[in-house]
């Protein structure tokens, strides 16, 4: 799992380790995880844009499914859109190439950030007007298309879900649009409330 220390990964790694065993879920992140998660199973410091290191990790651990969660989130992406494009697209392309050559499946989340102001607000269909207004949304839409391409062209089993805004206690604010809500809870705990 790339991006294991983020809002989704910090919850999903322990859940998957509980289901499949600590040695069957390899958590990776660009930064060190909290000690409890890092020590509960396999962990590697890994930059998901480094396709060679990613390929070596997948091969050495005989990975069958990559959960690709590493990303520059929306608010951070607006402060540095070039970095958001590079990290989000280069890491996804690296994951898809590794999956293609090593025969593993890929799950990568998308976001309601793919939509825009022209998208119907109620009962939004899967296939509709998509005019994202953030670099994060643009990379998620491009990512959906890239996953579809790898499935159609190379047979890579890719899956995804468009998540709404996420709020999690499992990870500190990481640059997303819902960080203000997460920060409220962290600040309250730090201030003794």
Segments the model singles out, each with a brief description of its role:
Residues 86, 93-135:
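Conserved Rossmann-fold NAD(P)-dependent oxidoreductase catalytic core, especially the SDR/UDP-sugar
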């Amino acid at each position: 799992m790339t991006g294991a220390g983020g809002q989704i990964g910090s919850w999903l790694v322990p859940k998957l380790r509980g289901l499949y065993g600590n040695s069957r879920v390899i958590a990776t992140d660009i930064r060190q995880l909290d000690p409890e998660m890092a020590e509960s199973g396999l962990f590697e410091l890994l930059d998901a844009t480094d396709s060679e290191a990613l390929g070596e990790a997948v091969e050495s651990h005989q990975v069958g499914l990559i959960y690709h969660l590493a990303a520059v989130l929306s608010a951070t992406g607006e402060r540095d859109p070039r970095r958001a494009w590079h990290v989000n697209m280069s890491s996804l392309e690296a994951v898809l190439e590794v999956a293609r050559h090593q025969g593993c499946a890929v799950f990568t989340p998308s976001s309601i950030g793919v939509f825009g102001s022209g998208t119907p607000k109620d009962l939004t269909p899967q296939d509709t007007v998509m005019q994202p207004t953030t670099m994060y949304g643009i990379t998620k839409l491009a990512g959906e298309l890239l996953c579809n391409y790898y499935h159609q062209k190379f047979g890579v089993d890719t899956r995804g879900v468009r998540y709404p805004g996420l709020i999690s206690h499992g990870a500190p604010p990481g640059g997303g649009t819902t960080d203000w809500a997460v920060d409220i809870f962290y600040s309250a705990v730090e201030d003794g409330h």
